[in-house]
């Protein structure tokens, strides 16, 4: 397919500070109706960590995730590597933080798989050969090589979820943020997704209600409730704290 170039943005990776990919300090956010969705959130992710974000509906998980690449903007401090999230750095940070929505149909809007996966690199102003290379690499990473000319809306839910992940991997992010990746998948597709997430060599923050997924895949777990981080620690320890889990509407898998 022909590729139309956009104005280039910086393609330099975000430099880490003390090994931290993400630092959130005292983040507070209220919606226009006055509802306070986040209360003084503190969170840090080191390079290579895979962290589960859990909690009941309405805990603030999705609101927090929408702050990580500037879709929402609350009070407090948020840094990706050493860069503060602000208008000056927003393009670089959005390339460094790949956000994958729960519903892949919210992310796949182009006629073909190739065009969906090429969208991000194309809007970075990359040359055509690099765009094609990134698309091929991203599709290979998610086990979807050869699907470039397929129509995105004709794919199964499991395939769409993989393509959604490929759309952000083509940006070569330093942090992958996923919202409910296993939702709506049959057992085979869920197992395939778990294997994919395990094998991807990238820092990850994953919001999920799938506690079996948390136990299997994530060494660290962060629990949110009513807009606050109420626990942050080793998954095995937190999952054995039945009082804590019950208090915050969670069940041991």
Q: Where is each model-derived feature located?
A:
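The feature captures the beta-strand-to-loop junction immediately N-terminal to the Walker
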Residues: 54-56
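Conserved ABC transporter NBD signature motif
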Residues: 74-85, 93
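Conserved ABC ATPase "signature" region
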Residues: 129-147
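Conserved ABC ATPase signature
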Residues: 151-155
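Catalytic Walker B motif of ABC-type/P-loop ATPase nucleotide-binding domains
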Residues: 176-179
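H-loop/switch region of ABC-family ATPase nucleotide-binding domains
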Residues: 208-209
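Conserved beta-strand-loop-alpha-helix hinge in the C-terminal portion
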Residues: 228-250
């Amino acid at each position: 397919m022909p590729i139309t170039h956009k104005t280039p943005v910086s393609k330099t990776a975000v430099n880490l500070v003390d090994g931290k990919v993400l630092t959130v300090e005292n983040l507070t956010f209220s919606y226009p109706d006055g509802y306070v969705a986040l209360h003084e959130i503190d969170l840090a992710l080191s390079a290579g960590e895979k962290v589960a974000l859990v909690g009941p509906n309405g805990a603030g998980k999705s609101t927090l995730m929408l702050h990580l690449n500037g879709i929402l903007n609350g009070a407090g401090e948020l840094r990706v590597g050493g860069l503060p999230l602000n208008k000056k750095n927003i393009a670089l940070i959005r390339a460094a933080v790949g956000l994958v929505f729960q519903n892949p149909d919210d992310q796949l809007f182009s006629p073909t798989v190739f065009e969906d996966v090429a969208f991000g690199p194309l809007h970075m102003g990359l040359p055509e050969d690099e765009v094609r290379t990134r698309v091929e690499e991203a599709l290979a990473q998610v086990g979807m090589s050869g699907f470039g000319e397929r129509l995105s809306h004709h794919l199964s839910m499991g395939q769409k979820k993989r393509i959604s992940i490929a759309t952000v991997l083509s940006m070569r992010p330093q942090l992958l943020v996923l919202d409910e990746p296993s939702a709506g998948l049959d057992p085979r597709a869920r197992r395939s997704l778990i294997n994919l997430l395990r094998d991807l060599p990238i820092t990850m923050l994953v919001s999920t209600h799938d506690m079996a997924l948390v136990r299997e895949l994530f060494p660290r777990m962060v629990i949110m409730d009513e807009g606050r981080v109420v626990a942050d620690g080793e998954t095995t320890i937190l999952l054995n704290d039945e009082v804590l889990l019950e208090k915050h509407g969670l069940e041991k898998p």
